[in-house]
């Protein structure tokens, strides 16, 4: 399926974006190995998260999916209750699922194969294979990409590990393995990354130690069931935040969005560029802060993106670069080589698309230089990447003509009702097949 957009006359209204994808995946995994029943409200029913649910079910976890209410009811099997799955576990398009499950499965008393779609089978896994091997795991792969064959070892040993890059997925993988290891596992990061796993471990009553740069867990503990309500995903909210910011006449409100400080890079950077964003009704529930976000149109200026904001914005850069494309002046992003190993090479995909829409964009090995200008209509390719697809749908709100975005089926992995909500606030996005359009 493709997207077809026409320019918007302005965004308005109030919407609630779906539950946070990262928190949803971690919550159901920890609930599955906890003792007792956990109800997960606000679970994101996207394809990536449902792949995680399916994998856990295949290992014996009882998970009732109430899809129309975004609720899961999980009967935890305890730390040692998982069983060998009957076949390979398919993680679909989800890098989070395969890396979290690798950590969980490294310490089990059975062997497992983890695989995924063609995109996932290109994603780098050496970053988890190496430290898990240091803990005593044995993992076979060809070229350090999926499929992964994990030979479970219930006698893992805790390690002290310095992450070569700020990566919440790698950190979380090792923390999960550390739950099953003898002794203490400590992970030190070069810069803060999202800390949902740490917050959820605390929510499920698992003791951990944390300082400014390191997090430690000791093996042998237990997780206790605890109901949880998932906040709205700020990565999904970011598309509407940018769309309202760049489109004249816009004013929207996004309700109950997760505002975890390790995820606020997109708001921090947009404010540096001159955005009019107000965060109100701040509350904290289930260890995660939540707030309403009000956004009004504003004129933006280009900036040099500070390196310390890169890990806090890593999933939002595709749509942030749309903001940069219409800002006055030049925006420079560096220290973001991680964007090249996402669902697609997001640096190359964004530069290609922006150039096709008339924007001067230059690719760097670890980033991009964008000279703000005027977005023209045209046709771009999402390269089967959900965030690229939605980012260019946002570009279509301000472009001088219609924008066609190719290959948008993967939006269902993270935001199944994106088109519905986009049109509700006035973005003018239509899903089309063949050569159809508005």
From Swiss-Prot:
Its main location: cytoplasm. Keywords: Amino-acid biosynthesis, Aromatic amino acid biosynthesis, Cytoplasm, Transferase. Pathway: Metabolic intermediate biosynthesis; chorismate biosynthesis; chorismate from D-erythrose 4-phosphate and phosphoenolpyruvate: step 6/7. Its EC number is 2.5.1.19. It catalyses: 3-phosphoshikimate + phosphoenolpyruvate = 5-O-(1-carboxyvinyl)-3-phosphoshikimate + phosphate. SUPFAM superfamilies: EPT/RTPC-like (SSF55205). Gene3D superfamilies: Enolpyruvate transferase domain. 3-phosphoshikimate binds at residues 21-22, 26, 167, 169, 315, 342. InterPro entries: Enolpyruvate_Tfrase_dom, Enolpyruvate_Tfrase_sf, EPSP_synthase, EPSP_synthase_CS, RNA3'P_cycl/enolpyr_Trfase_a/b. GO terms for cellular component: cytoplasm. One of its GO terms (molecular function) is 3-phosphoshikimate 1-carboxyvinyltransferase activity. The keyword Glycosyltransferase does not apply. NCBIfam families: aroA. Belongs to the EPSP synthase family. Catalyzes the transfer of the enolpyruvyl moiety of phosphoenolpyruvate (PEP) to the 5-hydroxyl of shikimate-3-phosphate (S3P) to produce enolpyruvyl shikimate-3-phosphate and inorganic phosphate. This is 3-phosphoshikimate 1-carboxyvinyltransferase. The gene is aroA.
């Amino acid at each position: 399926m493709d997207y077809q957009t026409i320019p918007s006359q302005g965004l308005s209204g109030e919407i609630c974006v779906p539950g946070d994808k990262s928190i949803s995946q971690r919550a159901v995994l920890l609930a599955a190995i906890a003792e007792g029943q956990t109800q997960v409200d606000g679970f994101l029913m996207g394809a990536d998260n449902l792949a995680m649910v399916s994998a856990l079910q295949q290992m014996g976890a009882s998970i009732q999916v109430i899809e129309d209410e975004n609720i899961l009811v999980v009967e935890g099997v305890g730390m040692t209750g998982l069983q060998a799955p009957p076949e390979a576990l398919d993680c679909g398009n989800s890098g989070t699922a395969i890396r979290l499950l690798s950590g969980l499965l490294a310490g089990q008393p059975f062997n497992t194969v983890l695989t995924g779609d063609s995109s996932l089978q290109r994603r780098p896994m050496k970053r988890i294979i190496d430290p898990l091997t240091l803990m005593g795991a044995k993992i076979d792969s060809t070229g350090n990409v999926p499929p992964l064959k994990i030979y479970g070892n219930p006698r893992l040993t805790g390690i002290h590990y310095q992450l070569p890059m700020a990566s919440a997925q790698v950190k979380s993988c090792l923390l999960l393995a550390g739950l099953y290891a003898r002794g203490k596992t400590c992970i030190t990061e070069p810069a803060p990354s999202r800390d949902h796993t740490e917050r959820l471990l605390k929510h499920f009553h698992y003791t951990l130690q944390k300082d400014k740069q390191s997090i430690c867990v000791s093996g042998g503990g237990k997780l206790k069931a605890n109901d949880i309500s998932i906040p709205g995903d700020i990565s999904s909210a970011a598309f509407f935040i940018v769309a309202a910011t760049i489109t004249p006449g816009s004013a929207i409100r996004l309700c109950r969005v997760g505002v975890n400080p390790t995820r606020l890079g997109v708001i921090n950077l947009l404010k540096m560029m001159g955005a009019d964003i107000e965060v109100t009704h701040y509350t904290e529930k289930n260890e995660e802060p939540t707030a309403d976000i009000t956004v009004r149109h504003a004129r933006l200026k280009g900036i040099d993106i500070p390196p310390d904001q890169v890990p806090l914005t890593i999933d939002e850069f595709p749509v942030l670069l749309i903001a940069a494309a219409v800002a006055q002046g030049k925006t420079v992003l560096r220290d973001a080589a991680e964007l090249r190993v996402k669902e697609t090479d997001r640096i190359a995909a964004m530069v290609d698309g922006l150039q096709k829409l008339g924007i001067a964009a230059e690719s760097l090995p670890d980033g991009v230089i964008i000279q703000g200008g005027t977005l023209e209509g045209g046709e771009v390719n999402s390269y089967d990447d959900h965030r690229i697809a939605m980012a260019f749908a946002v570009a279509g709100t301000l472009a001088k003509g219609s924008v066609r975005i190719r290959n948008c089926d993967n939006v269902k992995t993270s935001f199944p009702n994106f088109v519905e909500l986009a049109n509700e606030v006035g973005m003018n996005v239509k899903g089309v097949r063949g050569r159809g359009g508005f």
